[in-house]
Amino acid sequence: MQSAAETVENASILSGGSAQDGHRLWIGNIDPKITEYHLVKLLEKFGKVKQFDFLFHKSGPLEGQPRGYCFVNFHTKEEAERAIQCLNGKLALSKKLVVRWAHAQRFEPFRGEKNMPASLEPSSSEAEDLPTSLSVNAKIRAIEAKLQMMEENPDDYSGPSAYTYNKPPDKREKRSQPYHKHFRKHRR
C-alpha cells in the first residue's frame, strides 16, 4: 500500500502528462548493472512498448557504459500512466527508479555573445520546427555574419600575427673557459 505522500507525488506526475501528445516516459536513476533486456521485460508488464531508447556514453572514460536513464513509448496513455504509478520510486537493484513524462528540451541560445546577428536568434515558432542541429544555411549565415563583424571592427579581432618571430635577446656573454667534462664534480 502506498503512503499518502507517494500517492500525491504520483498524482502530480500523472497530471503533468495530460498535456503530452505522445506516451513517452523518461526513466532515470537506473542502476548500471541493469541491462537493456531486463528493463524491456520489466516495461512489457505494463503494456505494449512502441519504442525503447537505452542511452550509452559515446565517448570519454565511461564510453560504452549506460548513462543511467532511458526513454520508452507506450501505445496508450493508460499503459504509460500505469508504468509511472508502479515503477516510480520502486527499488531496482540498488537504486530507486524515477519515472516521469518525457519532455523535449528547449533550445537555449548562448547569451554571452554581445553582437549576435538577428538572423541567428531563433524565434519561438521556428525553434519547435527545426532539429536541434543548425542547418547548413544557418551555419553559412553565422560565418558570414562573423566575417562581416570582423571587417567592421578589425581592432577587436587583431591578435598576434601568425608569422611573428620573437628572436631571443642576443647574449654576448661568453664563458671565460670552454666547457670541459672534467671540471664538473661528480654528484650522485
From Swiss-Prot:
Protein's UniProt keywords contain RNA-binding: yes
UniProt cross-references to Pfam families, sorted A to Z: RRM_1
PROSITE patterns, sorted: RRM
Region (Disordered): 151-188
Keywords from the UniProt entry: RNA-binding
The keyword RNA-binding appears for this protein: yes
Superkingdom, taxonomy of origin: Eukaryota
Sequence ranges assigned to domain RRM in this UniProt record: 23-104
Gene3D superfamilies the record matches: 3.30.70.330
InterPro entries (alphabetical): Nucleotide-bd_a/b_plait_sf (IPR012677), RBD_domain_sf (IPR035979), RBM18_RRM (IPR039157), RRM_dom (IPR000504)
Molecular-function GO term, any one: RNA binding
Compositional bias (Basic residues): 177-188
Transmembrane segments: none
PANTHER family named among the record's database cross-references: HETEROGENEOUS NUCLEAR RIBONUCLEOPROTEIN
Protein known as: Probable RNA-binding protein 18
Organism in which the protein naturally occurs: Danio rerio (Zebrafish)
Species lineage: Eukaryota, Metazoa, Chordata, Craniata, Vertebrata
